[in-house]
């Protein structure tokens, strides 16, 4: 029988993406006002080019958007169920349709993977691990799924799906793009958004499972609480940060 080399799943990939010694810490930027999506996209594209040219440091940008939908490169038109409910933007990231809005913490991640690890699959695993460790600080058990990117929470008190799957909901989505080995776009974590706003799309093209949030799970936390936990978990995986305005 010929030897078959199996591709390792994301659970078994190393999750440490700390930069090579001597590089500056990652800028940690928080915006407290709602940021329009085109403004954020323009900022990311410009910052990514500056990182590649070694004219800007790596950065994580935490923010919230007004209510909107974004379409990734794999989005299907049929999954946009209510095209006039909120503005719809072509994101250019991987993935399908998702919702962004108040009460959701967005983390845009602009890292130079050449300084870290040039492995996109492992990078996505590291982002999932970052979220899982963040959730654990609030005693929420987040899990990854090999066939679905993102972080999921089991719902044992819910009925099984129509296909007989165990019930679980997505609490965090991941959609990234890598240009010249510099990442942008990032992750979104549902803290206390209006989950009804997801009804205008098929989130990430997945019909068998729903979405949840900290509040939906019974956890009343502030965005500041989330930001502290995100920073602590980020530094464990990606290395030191420095606050910027």
UniProtKB/Swiss-Prot annotation:
Alphabetic keyword roster: Acyltransferase, Cytoplasm, Transferase
Pfam families: LplA-B_cat
Positions that bind substrate: 93-100, 173-175, 186-188
EC number from the UniProt entry: 2.3.1.181
Catalytic residues of the enzyme: 204 (acyl-thioester intermediate)
Domain BPL/LPL catalytic as annotated: residue spans: 54-242
Listed Gene3D superfamilies: Bira Bifunctional Protein, Domain 2
Keyword Metal-binding belongs to the record: no
Site feature: Lowers pKa of active site Cys: 170
InterPro entries found in the cross-reference section: aa-tRNA-synth_II/BPL/LPL, BPL_LPL_catalytic, Octanoyltransferase, Octanoyltransferase_CS
Record GO biological process: protein modification process
Pathway the protein contributes to: Protein modification; protein lipoylation via endogenous pathway; protein N(6)-(lipoyl)lysine from octanoyl-[acyl-carrier-protein]: step 1/2
Family: Belongs to the LipB family.
Function of the protein: Catalyzes the transfer of endogenously produced octanoic acid from octanoyl-acyl-carrier-protein onto the lipoyl domains of lipoate-dependent enzymes. Lipoyl-ACP can also act as a substrate although octanoyl-ACP is likely to be the physiological substrate.
UniProt miscellaneous comment: In the reaction, the free carboxyl group of octanoic acid is attached via an amide linkage to the epsilon-amino group of a specific lysine residue of lipoyl domains of lipoate-dependent enzymes.
Protein name as annotated: Octanoyltransferase
Species this chain originates from: Bartonella quintana (strain Toulouse)
Gene this protein is translated from: lipB
